[in-house]
Structures are given as structure tokens and as C-alpha cells.
Amino acid sequence: SGTPNGQHGNTHEAKLIKLDGDKPNESVSVRKGETVLLNGSRSDVYVDEGGVFGGNATVKSLSVAGVVAPGNSPGKITVLNDFYMNGTGVYKAEILDKDHYDQIVAQSVQLSNGGNSSKLELVYLPGGTIKKGDTFTIINNNGSAPVQGTFNGLPEGAEFAVDGATFKISYVGGDGNDVVLTAQNDSTGPKAPNTGGENVAVNLAGTIVGVASAAILLFMAKRKSFGKK
């Protein structure tokens, strides 16, 4: 399959655009610097380099030169026909556990163009738990044809690690033509980012020590002054 042809519709200029409802005959273009979250259905979706497309959506076709990030952490995008990624495209997939992770469902899947492979960016969500042997079908290819191409640096059977979790990737998983990650070890998701509480505690302790030291010095100075009288 190739890049879908046709007129681009609904060109947006805002930074964040939220689209809801079903408009199956309306296409969407996601421009550089834009994030479009679609919770509903549209026709053809085009994601330019520098654009981000997400939400729980059903679309006729999806062409990605930017970033596709299904769901609202996590979720699913269903593509009724072709899912196409070019060399600058990035699939940002989030995983919480074996029952909660991002997925793209499509009738045909192409992950590279002219030798330039798209990229997989896997995110292990805080609070997640993964057991060895857990499988994650991040692309469910409903068509009969195999996946065309592979993600950059991840050939068939490659292993890679994300936040302590190691995965093996296959492009012939599931019923024979799905992109499936298999966990190679038990792991837990990363801790939530530090909100500054630890730094506050350290700074507060330092302040207390500083105040105490100042008080001691002041007391000793007064004693010396008193002794001279």
C-alpha cells in the first residue's frame, strides 16, 4: 500500500484540537506543531512531520509522517483500510499491563518507505506490571498480507529494553501477520516523576540545620561578650 491520495480536509492551526463524534466522510490533516485527539470516526487522516495524532478513533486510512499515539493513555485506533508510516513516522505505544496497552488495528500495514523505516517509541506507564511471557499486540493486522517493513533498528526477533522491561518483537505474531511484543522478564513500571517533594524536604532540612547553626553561633558570641564584662 502507499500514501493515500485525495483532498486534505479540516486543516487546523491550533496547538491542541479535540475532535469528537462520527463524520466518516470528513478527512483530517494534522500539521506540524499540532496535536489532534479524535474520539470518533473520520475518513482519511494525514499526519505531517511534527504533528501528533491520538485518541480512540476509527478512520478510513491513516498516513503518518509525524507521531501516532493511540488512545487517551492507553487506547486504540482502528484503520478500516491502509495504515502507512514513512521514514519520519513514529508509533508511540504505551503499555500498562497485558490488558491495557495501545493498539492499532488495520487491514494493511506498511512501516517503511524506500528503505527508510519508521520508529517505535515504547512507553512503560508508571504503576504498570508485566510478567515474563506477557504478549502485546501493538498492531493487529486484520488483512491477509504480511506487514511491509520493520521498525528502525528492530528486525524480526530483536530484543530491546524499556525502563527495566525487556521485549522481543515479531512481525509474524498473533495469527501470523501481527506486530507482537513478548515480555522477556518480570518488571514493574517506573515510579511517577518526582514532583519536587524530595527537594523540598532536603531544602527544608538544610534550612533547619542552618537556623540551628546560626542560633548556636549567636549564643556563643553572647557568652564571649558576657565573659568580657
Predicted features along the sequence, with ranges:
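Ser/Thr/Gly/Pro-rich low-complexity, disordered linker/stalk segments of secreted
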Residues: 1-11, 186-195
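Active-site and glycan-interaction determinants of carbohydrate-active enzymes
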Residues: 145-165
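Extracellular beta-strand/loop-rich repeat segments of large surface/secreted proteins
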Residues: 14-28, 37-135
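Short, hydrophobic alpha-helical membrane anchors of single-pass surface/secreted proteins
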Residues: 199-210
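Domain-terminus/edge residues, biased toward the C-terminal soluble/receptor-binding domains
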Residues: 28, 141-142, 170
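C-terminal low-complexity, Ser/Thr- and acidic/Pro-rich disordered "stalk" regions positioned immediately N-terminal
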Residues: 164-200
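Surface-exposed beta-strand/loop patches in extracellular or lumenal glycoproteins
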Residues: 136-140
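C-terminal membrane-anchoring or membrane-association module
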Residues: 212-229
